[in-house]
Amino acid sequence: MSTTSSSGRIAADQNNKCVNSVAAALCPLSNCQFSGVVISAITDEQKLEFSNKYNSSCTLSCSYDSQGVLLRIMLDNDQGHVLKEYMISADTDAAQLGRRCYAISLESDNLVLRFVSDKDQQLFRKVVENVKHLRPKSVFSQRTEESSASQYFQFYGYLSQQQNMMQDYVRTSTYQRAILGNAIDFQDKVVLDVGAGSGILSFFAVQAGAAKVYAIEASNMAQYAQQLVESNNVQHKISVIPGKIEEIELPEKVDVIISEPMGYMLYNERMLETYLHARKWLKPHGKMYPTHGDLHIAPFSDESLYSEQYNKANFWYQSAFHGVDLTTLHKEGMKEYFRQPIVDTFDIRICMAKSVRHVCDFLNDKEDDLHVIDIPLEFHILQTGICHGLAFWFDVEFSGSSQNVWLSTSPTAPLTHWYQVRCLLPMPIFIKQGQTLTGRVLLEANRRQSYDVTIDLHIEGTLISSSNTLDLKNPYFRYTGAPVQAPPGTNTQSPSEQYWTQMDTQGNRNSNSMLNGTLSVNGMGDGSMDITHGLLHPH
């Protein structure tokens, strides 16, 4: 028997056990009845107006069904005649109203049920809540803690956060250029925008001639995206669908999927899995924008950064902090600081070797491939020094029919809101030019929408090695906006002499300008004023 079929059978058995356990939970509630229930219909949702649906109080009968709970409504004084039957399923919307009332949407009816006692209302509510457990968890829910998802969608529901991303002009302009520069891929096509946010990428697709765009957004930003769609009069082109791509249904397959699913170190937030999941709606030979991502990894040397983190941890080395000995927490403090990836930017000359490239193919890789990412490393060291850890950045490519466009977060490219990421070693290693540094980076996905990152490095031919495990969910945002400083020791000439030589050259240029009758303005060679008239014709 193959492993695949065995795994499938086990999964099916587990699902059956889950359904059976829910059925068992519902059994005590089977055939339960609630008498004296007054049923009202909501006649005006905006004004919250109600009217009695039946002339007298009713009896509700609940019985278990394979699809949920079958609800039968009968008059109290004529229980032999069923007025209406409804199926309470996992998708039924309901809410408690006070102690005795309960609002529920059943088929095309929006009802308010008023029970004779608190106990009856609580028991009926329990029936509905138990049915909810019949709904299989989506792929997203299975891999994500509820608290993490709530925080995540709340964060991206703020206009300020959308603005932060939209004002990353490298990001936004690159996407627009990639889409408009490949209009042939969008003209009269159906497009899916995954995690649409404000809907900016959907608008780009319409600008490129898309016939229809489905903009999927799970946060509250969906309502703002809808406002933008309506105010820009493109509601006939863009359809905003609130929800997760793992849980919603589309009316048709799509020709192109667009998204901005990249996080720090490419994989953080685990949005890439959602992007890959969306391929279930992609037609054969459809396009993905972006098409693939390259994670770059390089060893670096930065004594200043290492000392900064080390000295922070030394706070816990005080034996008399306001009369309290903190030293017992020094080891844990050190571990915590070095578990933080550093988010900032740097001069690429701190890198000690050419970066290793790990490719994620968005068209072909599977979601499961991103659960554990094991990247082998081999670096041929170009400069002698102390290796303090590994630096990470990524590039993504938009492979279009007309042109290929790259979005890069490299330290050699214009800065983006992704910056770069560095992972420190608590025990740095000294390595010489010409030696080979080997090892691995292991990214293990967790349910907090992030990864535990383990780095293991070893100098080939020696017993020297170092390792660390970091929490990508808890980075240290170090970027201050200050210009990036060149690494120490990169000057091959005297900076002082270079400066004075430059000033002397500028002084000679100004002197020559005066002799020629012109003087540069504010040191700018292209702006000048004529001084000969004043010299030859003084007032």
From Swiss-Prot:
Keywords per UniProt: Chromatin regulator, Cytoplasm, Methylation, Methyltransferase, Nucleus, S-adenosyl-L-methionine, Transcription, Transcription regulation, Transferase
Modified residues (Asymmetric dimethylarginine): 509
Positions bound to S-adenosyl-L-methionine: 162, 171, 195, 217, 246, 274
The protein's name: Histone-arginine methyltransferase CARMER
Function: Methylates (mono- and asymmetric dimethylation) the guanidino nitrogens of arginyl residues in proteins. May methylate histone H3 at 'Arg-17' and activate transcription via chromatin remodeling.
Recorded family membership: Belongs to the class I-like SAM-binding methyltransferase superfamily. Protein arginine N-methyltransferase family.
Domain SAM-dependent MTase PRMT-type: 149-458
UniProt GO MF annotations: histone H3R17 methyltransferase activity; histone H3R2 methyltransferase activity; histone H3R26 methyltransferase activity; protein-arginine omega-N asymmetric methyltransferase activity; protein-arginine omega-N monomethyltransferase activity
Superkingdom to which the source organism belongs: Eukaryota
Gene Ontology, cellular component aspect: cytoplasm; cytosol; histone methyltransferase complex; nucleus
Subcellular location: Cytoplasm; Nucleus
PROSITE patterns recorded: SAM_MT_PRMT
Organism for this UniProt entry: Drosophila mojavensis (Fruit fly)
Record Pfam families: PrmA, PRMT_C
Catalytic activity: L-arginyl-[protein] + 2 S-adenosyl-L-methionine = N(omega),N(omega)-dimethyl-L-arginyl-[protein] + 2 S-adenosyl-L-homocysteine + 2 H(+)
UniProt record, GO biological process: chromatin remodeling; peptidyl-arginine methylation, to asymmetrical-dimethyl arginine; positive regulation of ecdysone receptor signaling pathway; positive regulation of transcription by RNA polymerase II; regulation of DNA-templated transcription
Entry's EC annotation: 2.1.1.319
Post-translational modification: The dimethylated protein is the major form.
Main location: cytoplasm
